[in-house]
Amino acid sequence: RKCLNTPLPLFYKTCPEGKDLCYKMNFKLLPKKLSIKRGCTDTCPKSSLLVKVVCCDTDKCNK
């Protein structure tokens, strides 16, 4: 899997074995285009009151 891994969707990395999901975290109070974190994960982190988490399972899907 290849996931974007910077706040701006410019760079990606190949995920280590076992981390087959890409994720993107956004502050709910900021514009949706401003991601605070992106990367690879094995399980999708849960959203909270302030942070929305979106996970996906295709290459570079966490734009």
From Swiss-Prot:
Enumerate the UniProt keywords alphabetically.
Disulfide bond, Secreted, Toxin
The record's listing under Pfam families reads: Toxin_cobra-type
Cystine crosslinks? C3-C22, C15-C40, C44-C55, C56-C61
Q: Which subcellular locations apply to this protein?
A: Secreted
For this protein, the record's Gene3D superfamilies field holds:
CD59
Q: What is its main location?
A: secreted
Q: Which InterPro entries match?
A: Cytotoxin_Cobra, Snake_3FTx, Snake_toxin-like_sf, Snake_toxin_con_site, Toxin_cobra-type
Q: Name one GO cellular component term.
A: extracellular region
Give GO terms: molecular function aspect only: toxin activity
Tell me which tissues or organs this protein is expressed in: Expressed by the venom gland.
Also noted in the record is: Is classified as a P-type cytotoxin, since a proline residue stands at position 31 (Pro-31 in standard classification).
Indicate the family of this protein. Answer: Belongs to the three-finger toxin family. Short-chain subfamily. Orphan group XVI sub-subfamily.
Q: What is this protein called?
A: Cytotoxin homolog S3C2
